[in-house]
Amino acid sequence: MAVKMKKPDYWPTLEEGERLAGIQRERDAKRRSIINKEDCIRIRGANEHNLKNLTLEIPRNELVVLTGLSGSGKSSLAFDTIYAEGQRRYMESLSSYARQFLGQMEKPDVEKIEGLSPAISIDQKSTNRNPRSTVGTVTEIYDYFRLLYARIGIPHCPNCGREIARQTVDQMVDRIMELPERTRIQILAPVVRGRKGEHQKVIDRARKAGYVRLRIDGNLYDVSEDIKLEKNIKHNIEVIVDRLVVKEGIERRLTDSVENALQLADGLLQVDVVDGELMQFSQSFACPDCGISVPEIEPRSFSFNNPFGACPVCAGLGYRMEFAPELIVPDETRSINEGAIAVLGWQSCMNKGSFANAILQALTEKFGFSMDTPYKDLKPEVKKMLMYGTDQSVDVYYEGQRGKGVYPVTFDGLIRNTEQRYRETASDTMKAEYESFMRITPCGTCGGKRLRKESLAVTVGGIDIYDLTCMSIRTLQDFLDNLELTTTQQKIGHQVLKEIKARVGFLIDVGLDYLTLARATATLSGGEAQRIRLATQIGSGLVGVCYILDEPSIGLHQRDNDKLLRTLKNLRDLWNTVIVVEHDEDTMLAADYIVDIGPGAGSHGGQVVAQGTAEEIMAVPESITGQYLSGKKAIPVPEDRREPTGWIKVRGARVNNLKNIDVEIPLGIMTVVTGVSGSGKSSLVNEILYKHLAKTLNRARTIAGEHDGIDGLENLDKVIAIDQSPIGRTPRSNPATYTGVFDMIRALFAGTPDAKAKGYSKGRFSFNVKGGRCEACGGDGILKIEMHFLPDVYVPCEVCHGKRYNRETLEVRYKGKNIYDVLDMTVEEAVTFFENVPSIRRKIQTLYDVGLGYVKLGQPSTELSGGEAQRIKLATELSRKSTGKTIYILDEPTTGLHFEDVAKLNVILHQLVEGGNTVVVIEHNLDVIKTADYIIDMGPEGGDGGGTVVAAGTPEEVAKVHSSYTGYYVNKMLERDKARGDR
C-alpha cells in the first residue's frame, strides 16, 4: 500500500550529511579552545523539590543538556533553581517602585550559585490563549507589516476596487453640495480620534481660535465650560467649525469652513448630516467614481485589535459564535419524545406537564407534525420553524401548580430562545454549557479577515495584508524576495522590509516554515510556541545571557531537528549559555556538555549520575541515559507485526491543508501517524477522525472538519482521546480524585472501627465539603496573603498546618496513617501500603506502571506537566475493563519522556492493543514509530506542501519509500538496531 513519490532534489545524501557534520565539529572544537575552562556556573547545595543537596559546575557559553528520567529533578534544577535565582537577582537590582509592577520571585532552596547571568526562560507553559493573539503579533512581524502598509501601501476603493488618490478642497465642497437642498449639516474637525488623555491643550487651542462648541464622545460641550476628561479612557473630540443648510450661494462660506476644518484636523474633515450618515473626507484619499473617502492610512488602520482597523461587526475576531442546529439536535434518528432536542432549557420537552412540552404540543397542532416522528423525517419547513421560530401566535394550553389556562405564545425558535438564555445567565458554568452547543463561523461582514473593508483595500505588491498573513512562512519569504517596488517605495520601506525578512528567516531556521502569520497562538502546540519565542530571542541578539529551554524538539520531525540544533548553536555562539532540558538523542549528541540527573524519579532522583560530553556519559555504567546512547540498552523492534482485524476509511478529508484525500486506518493494531510539522497529521486525526467518532459513537457535541464520511464504524463502540490537557484546573484536583481511587480510599477510612464508632461516612474524608475539612482554609491547606508591591505569599494554614482536614478527621487512622498521610504518599509508597486491598492497589498499580511512581496521590493538578497528566489519563483507562472495541487516540504521548519512560509507555500502548482495541498515535519519536504495526506518513512537506499520504504500511515497508522523510529515518533506525543486534 506504500505510495511512491519523486524523491526531492534537495534531500542530502548520507555522505553530504557526514561532511557537514565534520565541518561543524571542527568549528565547535575551535570555539571551545578559546573558552575559559574556569568560566562556569557553580551550584552548591541545591535542595529544591527532590534535589538532594546537589552540587555541580555547568560550563558557561556552552550548549548544555540536562537529561534524566521523568521526575528526576531536571526542571527543578533548570527552572526552579538556576532560572529562579538568575531572575530573582536581576529583579532585586531594580527599585521597589519597579518591582511592584514586575513582582518578585521567591529565593530557591540553594546554598550558593556563582557565575550566574541574567536568565531567560523559554518554556511551553506560557502559550497565549487569547483569540486575538497570532503568530504575526507574538513575533511582531505583523507590527512591521502594519507600518509597511501604512507607508507604502496603495489604497483602493473598497466599493469598486479602483486605485484612489487624494481629494482637494474643491472636490470635497462639490460632494457636499450634491446633498439634497435644505439638508442641515455640521462641519466638524476631528482633532482627537480614539486617543487616551485629558487633551486640555486641544480644548484650549479650540477656545483660543474662537470656536464655540466641541463634540466630545458624541456629547456637545460649550468651550466656556470647565471640561475635565478621564485620562485613561479613549476619547473622540471634534471641533464644530460651522453649521449650514445646503442651498445655493453657500459655496464660499462652505469652502472657508472646510479649509478651516482641514487645517485644524491635519487634512481630515467630517460632515455630520442631520438625520443622515456621517460623511468623512480626507485630503489624502477618495474614489472619484464612487465618491467614497478613505480615512488617513495609519499603522493602526491594519490592527484588528484597534477599533480604527477592526471589523466593526466581529470586533476584529474574524468569527462569530452561534448556536448550531446539528448540536441542538445531535441525533436526528430520535423523535422529540425520544429526546432529540439536547439543548438546555428544552430537554424537558418530552415530559408531559412541562411548559416546553405544552408549547411543542401547540406547535404540532398548528403545523401538523408529530413529536413521535424521527427528527430527520420532519418536513424542512417544520425543522426551520423549530429552529428559527414563527411569527404566527399559537395557543398553549398549560396546567401548572397555579392552575390551568390558555396562553397565546409567539414561538421564537430553539436558537433564538437559547441565545436569550445564554445572554441572560450570570453563571459561568451555564455559559460554558451553552457554548458547547455553539460553533465558530466566519464573520459575514469581513469574511473572517478581521479588518475593515477600507484597510483590506490597501495593497503592497498587489496583495492585501490579510492575504499576506495567510501565506506560509516559506511562501512569504519567496514573496518578499521577489517583491517589486518603485524607487520611492523602496527608499521608504527598505529598513522595515529588512526587519521583516530577518524575522521570517528566524522562523524558518527553527522549522516553522509551514505556519502562517494569521495562525492563532491558541492552536499552536507547546513545542511550536516555544520555538516561536526562541526565534524572537535570536532576533534580539542579546549577549551574555543564560537561556533555559524546555524540550524545544517537541513536535519536531527528525528532518527539522538539524535546523533547531543550528539555531541553538547560533544562540550559543553569541556568547550565551544555553541550558536545554531534553530527551532527544540528536540534541544530546550535539551538546557540548550533558548533565544526567537521577538515577530514578521522585525520591529516587535528585542527584548527578553523570556529567561531561556524550562520550563520557556513555562510559558511566550507572547512567541509564548513557546506556541508551551507547546502545547497551534499547527499545526492541517487535519480531512480528500484528495483522489488522478490520479497516475504517476516511473519505474526502479536506480540512485545513488536507487535499481531499481518502485514508484507510487499520483496526485492532497500533498505528502511528507521522509526517513533518504541519503536514496534516492533527487535521486528519484530531479534527476529522476523533471528532467524527466522538459524535457518532459517544454522542458528543462536536463538529468534525470537512470530509465526506467515515466507513467501517460498526467494528467500534467508543473513542477515547488521551491528550495532555490538565486533569483539573484547580489545586483540589489530583491523581487520586481523577482516577477515582480517592473515593475507594475514603470508603476504606469510613469502614474503620473508629470511623464507624463516630458515625463518619466517606463524605467526612472529603476536603471539598463541610464536615471533615478544615474550615479555616476551606480544605485548601494554605492561605493567601497579599503583599502589595511584593508577590502574594502562600502560607500553611495555622489551624490544620497544611493538612486540609480538622483534628477529629485526622484522628481516624488506617494501618497507622490518617487521610492526609495517604494523600501525601507517592504512588510507589501507596502500592505497598494498599497491597492487601486489591481494588485500590489495582488502580494505583496502573499509575506506577506508566512511570508515575514518584508522583504523590494528592499532588495538585496545577503542578503536573502535560506529559504527566496524559499518563494519568492512560492509567485511568488501563484500570477500566476493556470492551475490545475501543479506539484510543493519542497526540505525541512521548512528550517529556526519557528513553526508559518511552519503553514503559510502549508496553502500555501495546497492552491496550492486546485487549483487542485500536490505538492511533500522532508521533515523531522513532522508538515508538519503529515498534508500531502500521505507519501512515503525511506530507511530503508542511502547510500547502502537505496534506497527502506519502506512504502507508509497516515500518519496513515505509522505510523503502524514498520520497518519505519518515521512511528515511526509520530505515536508519532499523539498520542501526540490526547492526547492534537488538533484534
What are these regions (language model features)?
Residues 1-983:
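Conserved phosphate-binding elements of NTP-dependent enzyme cores
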